[in-house]
């Protein structure tokens, strides 16, 4: 489902988004709203938004934590850091995302999928922000669950 990152969301797209949430098809969403950033030398997500929880509650859908292994170029992370240092709000590093995608050609990455979490179980973790942090920790924990990728010879 397309998401407009630079303005208001078209009402037809917003309606389509809501319709998909009440359907049966799994939906993969990136709750941070942006690609991960290099913070303190570690590639990690920015704080997660809570909209995925609101939609899950409204539709009574389970949440399945997912960790997508991967890394963008050092150039991308440097541009993102420079933009923040300069105080620019416009996400200029997004201009390089197509190039980043095509530079991944031929590379493999792994996707780790966790156990479903019923929304009724999430309420014990506090408010929506605390619940989002709980799901985020579950997703990041998945990276440590599997053996490292075998080295190529």
Language-model-derived ranges and their functions:
Residues 1-12:
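Membrane-interfacial amphipathic helices and adjacent loop/beta segments
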